[in-house]
Amino acid sequence: MPVYAALDVSKASTQVHVVDETGTCLWRGKSLTHPEALAETLAPFANDLVKVGLETCCLSTWLGHELRGRGLPVVCMDARQAHAALSVTMNKTDANDARGLAHLLRAGLYREVRLKGWDDVRLWTLIHARRALLRAQIDVANALRGALRTQG
Protein backbone atom coordinates (compact mmCIF):
# COMPACT_ATOMS: atom_id res chain seq x y z
CA MET A 1 0.00 0.00 0.00
CA PRO A 2 1.50 3.40 -1.00
CA VAL A 3 2.52 5.59 1.92
CA TYR A 4 3.41 9.31 1.97
CA ALA A 5 5.41 11.06 4.69
CA ALA A 6 5.75 14.79 5.25
CA LEU A 7 8.36 16.54 7.35
CA ASP A 8 7.82 19.98 8.88
CA VAL A 9 11.43 20.86 9.61
CA SER A 10 12.64 23.22 12.33
CA LYS A 11 16.07 23.69 13.86
CA ALA A 12 15.84 21.25 16.77
CA SER A 13 12.95 18.92 15.96
CA THR A 14 10.92 17.85 12.95
CA GLN A 15 7.23 17.07 12.96
CA VAL A 16 6.52 13.90 10.93
CA HIS A 17 3.14 12.87 9.50
CA VAL A 18 2.64 9.61 7.57
CA VAL A 19 -0.53 8.89 5.57
CA ASP A 20 -1.66 6.11 3.25
CA GLU A 21 -3.19 6.56 -0.22
CA THR A 22 -6.66 7.20 1.25
CA GLY A 23 -5.37 9.92 3.58
CA THR A 24 -5.61 7.86 6.75
CA CYS A 25 -3.00 8.85 9.33
CA LEU A 26 -0.64 5.94 9.95
CA TRP A 27 1.75 7.76 12.27
CA ARG A 28 2.44 11.25 13.53
CA GLY A 29 5.01 12.53 15.94
CA LYS A 30 8.30 14.34 16.43
CA SER A 31 11.84 13.40 15.61
CA LEU A 32 15.18 15.13 15.95
CA THR A 33 16.19 17.19 12.94
CA HIS A 34 18.96 14.84 11.91
CA PRO A 35 19.00 12.46 8.92
CA GLU A 36 19.81 9.45 11.10
CA ALA A 37 16.91 10.11 13.46
CA LEU A 38 14.49 10.82 10.61
CA ALA A 39 15.51 7.69 8.70
CA GLU A 40 15.01 5.67 11.88
CA THR A 41 11.57 7.24 12.38
CA LEU A 42 10.53 6.40 8.81
CA ALA A 43 12.10 2.91 8.82
CA PRO A 44 8.84 1.02 9.60
CA PHE A 45 7.32 2.50 6.42
CA ALA A 46 10.45 2.34 4.21
CA ASN A 47 9.20 -0.43 1.90
CA ASP A 48 5.89 1.31 1.18
CA LEU A 49 7.07 4.93 1.01
CA VAL A 50 6.28 6.54 -2.33
CA LYS A 51 7.42 10.05 -1.37
CA VAL A 52 8.88 11.85 1.60
CA GLY A 53 8.18 15.56 1.32
CA LEU A 54 9.79 18.53 2.99
CA GLU A 55 9.51 22.26 2.34
CA THR A 56 12.41 24.33 1.10
CA CYS A 57 14.38 25.76 4.01
CA CYS A 58 17.98 26.26 5.09
CA LEU A 59 18.22 22.59 6.16
CA SER A 60 16.47 21.03 3.15
CA THR A 61 19.63 20.54 1.05
CA TRP A 62 21.42 18.69 3.84
CA LEU A 63 18.40 16.63 4.91
CA GLY A 64 17.33 15.90 1.34
CA HIS A 65 20.70 14.58 0.20
CA GLU A 66 21.30 12.61 3.38
CA LEU A 67 17.85 10.98 3.34
CA ARG A 68 18.20 10.16 -0.37
CA GLY A 69 21.55 8.59 0.45
CA ARG A 70 19.70 6.35 2.90
CA GLY A 71 17.35 5.22 0.13
CA LEU A 72 14.31 7.38 0.90
CA PRO A 73 12.38 8.96 -2.02
CA VAL A 74 12.71 12.59 -0.91
CA VAL A 75 10.84 15.40 -2.67
CA CYS A 76 11.56 19.05 -1.87
CA MET A 77 8.38 21.12 -2.09
CA ASP A 78 8.17 24.85 -2.91
CA ALA A 79 7.61 26.58 0.44
CA ARG A 80 5.67 29.54 -0.99
CA GLN A 81 3.14 27.35 -2.73
CA ALA A 82 2.82 25.08 0.30
CA HIS A 83 2.41 28.10 2.58
CA ALA A 84 -0.38 29.44 0.38
CA ALA A 85 -2.18 26.10 0.52
CA LEU A 86 -1.67 25.68 4.27
CA SER A 87 -2.61 29.25 5.20
CA VAL A 88 -6.33 28.37 5.14
CA THR A 89 -5.99 26.05 8.15
CA MET A 90 -7.61 27.30 11.33
CA ASN A 91 -5.02 26.17 13.87
CA LYS A 92 -1.54 26.72 12.41
CA THR A 93 0.85 24.42 14.28
CA ASP A 94 3.83 22.35 13.18
CA ALA A 95 1.76 19.17 13.52
CA ASN A 96 -1.04 20.57 11.35
CA ASP A 97 1.50 21.84 8.81
CA ALA A 98 3.02 18.35 8.56
CA ARG A 99 -0.48 16.88 8.13
CA GLY A 100 -1.29 19.39 5.39
CA LEU A 101 2.02 18.74 3.62
CA ALA A 102 1.33 15.00 3.68
CA HIS A 103 -2.05 15.52 2.02
CA LEU A 104 -0.56 17.89 -0.59
CA LEU A 105 2.08 15.25 -1.30
CA ARG A 106 -0.50 12.47 -1.56
CA ALA A 107 -2.71 14.51 -3.93
CA GLY A 108 0.24 15.68 -6.04
CA LEU A 109 -0.62 19.35 -5.37
CA TYR A 110 2.92 20.64 -4.99
CA ARG A 111 5.74 22.05 -7.08
CA GLU A 112 8.99 20.14 -6.76
CA VAL A 113 12.15 22.16 -6.21
CA ARG A 114 15.57 20.88 -7.25
CA LEU A 115 17.99 20.38 -4.40
CA LYS A 116 21.33 22.06 -5.06
CA GLY A 117 24.32 19.79 -5.38
CA TRP A 118 27.00 19.74 -2.69
CA ASP A 119 29.56 21.32 -5.04
CA ASP A 120 27.23 24.27 -5.67
CA VAL A 121 26.58 24.68 -1.95
CA ARG A 122 30.29 24.61 -1.09
CA LEU A 123 31.12 27.15 -3.81
CA TRP A 124 28.31 29.47 -2.69
CA THR A 125 29.52 29.17 0.92
CA LEU A 126 33.07 30.14 -0.06
CA ILE A 127 31.87 33.10 -2.13
CA HIS A 128 29.61 34.26 0.70
CA ALA A 129 32.42 33.94 3.29
CA ARG A 130 34.82 35.86 1.03
CA ARG A 131 32.26 38.64 0.57
CA ALA A 132 31.75 38.87 4.35
CA LEU A 133 35.52 39.06 4.98
CA LEU A 134 35.97 41.79 2.36
CA ARG A 135 33.09 43.77 3.86
CA ALA A 136 34.65 43.45 7.34
CA GLN A 137 38.05 44.54 6.01
CA ILE A 138 36.53 47.62 4.37
CA ASP A 139 34.59 48.48 7.56
CA VAL A 140 37.75 48.29 9.70
CA ALA A 141 39.73 50.40 7.22
CA ASN A 142 36.97 53.02 7.11
CA ALA A 143 36.71 53.11 10.92
CA LEU A 144 40.47 53.63 11.27
CA ARG A 145 40.48 56.28 8.56
CA GLY A 146 37.63 58.10 10.31
CA ALA A 147 39.36 57.92 13.70
CA LEU A 148 42.67 59.20 12.29
CA ARG A 149 41.02 61.96 10.25
CA THR A 150 40.48 64.02 13.40
CA GLN A 151 44.24 63.85 14.10
CA GLY A 152 45.07 65.42 10.74
Q: What positions do the PLM features span?
A:
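Phosphate- and other anionic-substrate recognition elements at nucleic-acid/protein interfaces
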Residues: 1-152
